[in-house]
Regions:
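Catalytic phosphate/metal-binding cores of nucleic-acid and nucleotide-processing enzymes, i.e., regions
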Residues: 1-116
Length: 116
Protein backbone atom coordinates (compact mmCIF):
# COMPACT_ATOMS: atom_id res chain seq x y z
CA UNK A 1 0.00 0.00 0.00
CA UNK A 2 1.31 3.44 -0.91
CA UNK A 3 1.51 6.06 1.84
CA UNK A 4 0.02 9.56 1.60
CA UNK A 5 3.34 11.15 0.57
CA UNK A 6 3.87 8.47 -2.07
CA UNK A 7 0.42 9.17 -3.50
CA UNK A 8 1.17 12.90 -3.62
CA UNK A 9 4.44 12.24 -5.42
CA UNK A 10 2.77 9.88 -7.91
CA UNK A 11 0.01 12.40 -8.58
CA UNK A 12 2.58 15.13 -9.19
CA UNK A 13 4.41 12.88 -11.67
CA UNK A 14 1.16 12.11 -13.49
CA UNK A 15 0.17 15.78 -13.60
CA UNK A 16 3.58 16.83 -14.98
CA UNK A 17 3.47 14.05 -17.59
CA UNK A 18 0.00 15.13 -18.77
CA UNK A 19 1.03 18.80 -18.91
CA UNK A 20 4.18 18.01 -20.91
CA UNK A 21 2.15 15.92 -23.36
CA UNK A 22 -0.35 18.76 -23.72
CA UNK A 23 2.61 21.00 -24.62
CA UNK A 24 3.67 18.58 -27.38
CA UNK A 25 6.44 16.64 -25.64
CA UNK A 26 6.73 12.87 -25.53
CA UNK A 27 6.70 12.05 -21.81
CA UNK A 28 6.64 8.69 -20.02
CA UNK A 29 6.96 7.81 -16.36
CA UNK A 30 9.79 5.38 -15.63
CA UNK A 31 9.54 2.31 -13.41
CA UNK A 32 11.23 2.46 -10.01
CA UNK A 33 14.23 0.12 -9.76
CA UNK A 34 15.88 0.87 -6.41
CA UNK A 35 19.61 1.60 -6.74
CA UNK A 36 19.27 1.33 -10.53
CA UNK A 37 16.48 3.92 -10.80
CA UNK A 38 16.58 5.78 -14.11
CA UNK A 39 14.69 8.90 -13.06
CA UNK A 40 10.99 9.52 -12.66
CA UNK A 41 10.28 10.48 -16.25
CA UNK A 42 11.84 10.46 -19.70
CA UNK A 43 10.90 13.38 -21.94
CA UNK A 44 11.66 13.78 -25.62
CA UNK A 45 11.45 17.27 -27.11
CA UNK A 46 12.59 18.00 -30.68
CA UNK A 47 14.45 14.68 -30.77
CA UNK A 48 16.41 15.38 -27.55
CA UNK A 49 16.00 13.08 -24.55
CA UNK A 50 15.83 14.44 -21.00
CA UNK A 51 15.53 12.70 -17.65
CA UNK A 52 13.39 14.31 -14.96
CA UNK A 53 13.54 13.73 -11.24
CA UNK A 54 10.29 15.04 -9.75
CA UNK A 55 9.90 16.13 -6.14
CA UNK A 56 6.77 17.01 -4.19
CA UNK A 57 8.21 17.74 -0.75
CA UNK A 58 7.92 20.53 1.76
CA UNK A 59 11.63 20.46 2.55
CA UNK A 60 13.92 21.22 -0.36
CA UNK A 61 17.32 19.54 -0.30
CA UNK A 62 18.61 20.62 -3.69
CA UNK A 63 22.09 19.00 -3.49
CA UNK A 64 20.46 15.64 -2.70
CA UNK A 65 17.88 16.05 -5.47
CA UNK A 66 20.57 17.07 -7.98
CA UNK A 67 22.86 14.12 -7.16
CA UNK A 68 19.92 11.76 -7.51
CA UNK A 69 19.01 13.21 -10.92
CA UNK A 70 22.59 12.88 -12.18
CA UNK A 71 22.99 9.27 -11.00
CA UNK A 72 19.64 8.26 -12.44
CA UNK A 73 20.36 9.83 -15.84
CA UNK A 74 23.61 7.84 -15.92
CA UNK A 75 21.67 4.66 -15.01
CA UNK A 76 19.23 5.40 -17.85
CA UNK A 77 22.09 5.76 -20.35
CA UNK A 78 23.90 2.63 -19.14
CA UNK A 79 20.75 0.49 -19.26
CA UNK A 80 20.25 1.44 -22.90
CA UNK A 81 23.88 1.41 -24.02
CA UNK A 82 23.79 5.11 -24.88
CA UNK A 83 27.08 6.81 -25.64
CA UNK A 84 25.90 10.07 -24.12
CA UNK A 85 24.10 10.66 -20.83
CA UNK A 86 20.88 12.65 -21.33
CA UNK A 87 20.59 16.00 -19.60
CA UNK A 88 18.67 15.73 -16.37
CA UNK A 89 16.57 18.17 -14.41
CA UNK A 90 14.89 18.28 -11.04
CA UNK A 91 11.28 19.44 -11.17
CA UNK A 92 9.97 20.65 -7.81
CA UNK A 93 6.30 21.24 -7.07
CA UNK A 94 5.51 24.75 -5.91
CA UNK A 95 3.00 24.99 -3.10
CA UNK A 96 -0.34 26.53 -4.07
CA UNK A 97 0.68 26.83 -7.71
CA UNK A 98 -0.28 25.15 -10.97
CA UNK A 99 1.88 22.52 -12.67
CA UNK A 100 3.28 24.99 -15.19
CA UNK A 101 4.70 27.00 -12.27
CA UNK A 102 6.81 24.13 -10.91
CA UNK A 103 10.49 24.93 -10.48
CA UNK A 104 13.03 23.36 -12.84
CA UNK A 105 16.51 22.99 -11.34
CA UNK A 106 19.79 22.56 -13.20
CA UNK A 107 23.36 23.66 -12.60
CA UNK A 108 25.19 26.48 -14.35
CA UNK A 109 27.47 24.15 -16.34
CA UNK A 110 24.47 22.35 -17.81
CA UNK A 111 22.71 25.63 -18.54
CA UNK A 112 25.62 27.04 -20.54
CA UNK A 113 26.11 23.72 -22.37
CA UNK A 114 22.53 23.97 -23.61
CA UNK A 115 23.03 27.55 -24.78
CA UNK A 116 26.19 26.93 -26.84
Amino acid sequence: MVNKNGRKGSQFETDVMKWLRKMGAIAERLTKAGAKDEGDMVVIISGETYILELKNRQTLTLPEFWREAQVEALNYAKARGLGEVPLSYVVVKRRNASIDQAWVIQDLAQWIKEKQ
